[in-house]
A protein has these predicted regions:
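N-terminal interaction/assembly modules
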Residues: 1-108, 113-114, 119-121
Length: 121
C-alpha cells in the first residue's frame, strides 16, 4: 500500500524534485519556497549539486560495475546522490533516519518494486 506524501511535510520530496529539475531539466532557477526546513533543503540541494563529482566517485567506488549510477533510472540517481551527500556531510543525522526518509520519499516517485530495489542498493 502506498502512503500518501505531502511535500509540505517531507523535505526529502522537495530535495528530490529540486535536484531532478536541476540535473535533468536544466532548471537553474533554484528558488526555495518558505518551509520550516528551508535551510536544510537548501543546504542539501546546493551541497549535492556542488559536490556532484565527489558523490559520483564515492558511488562508483562502492557499487559493482553492473550497478553504476549512470545505469540507474534518473530518479534513482537523484535519490542516491542526495542520500550520499547526507551520509558524507550531515554526520549528525543518523544513517538509519536518512535511509528511512529517502525510502519514504521515494514512494512519491517510484512503484513499490522499485522502492524495494532502491532499498537493496
Amino acid at each position: 500500500m502506498r502512503t500518501p506524501y505531502n511535500p509540505n511535510q517531507s523535505p526529502r520530496v522537495i530535495i528530490i524534485q529540486k535536484l531532478y529539475g536541476n540535473f535533468y531539466n536544466d532548471d537553474t532557477d533554484l528558488t526555495f519556497a518558505k518551509h520550516r526546513f528551508k535551510k536544510f533543503i537548501k543546504d542539501v540541494v546546493l551541497g549535492t549539486i556542488e559536490r556532484d563529482e565527489v558523490i559520483k566517485e564515492e558511488v562508483k567506488n562502492h557499487l559493482s560495475e553492473d550497478l553504476q549510477l549512470t545505469n540507474l533510472d534518473k530518479v534513482f540517481q537523484v535519490i542516491v546522490k542526495s542520500a550520499i551527500f547526507e551520509f558524507l556531510y550531515k554526520p549528525k543525522i543518523p544513517t538509519k533516519i536518512i535511509i528511512k526518509e529517502y525510502l519514504d520519499a521515494s514512494n512519491f516517485f517510484l512503484e513499490d518494486g522499485q522502492t524495494k530495489y532502491l532499498n537493496a542498493i
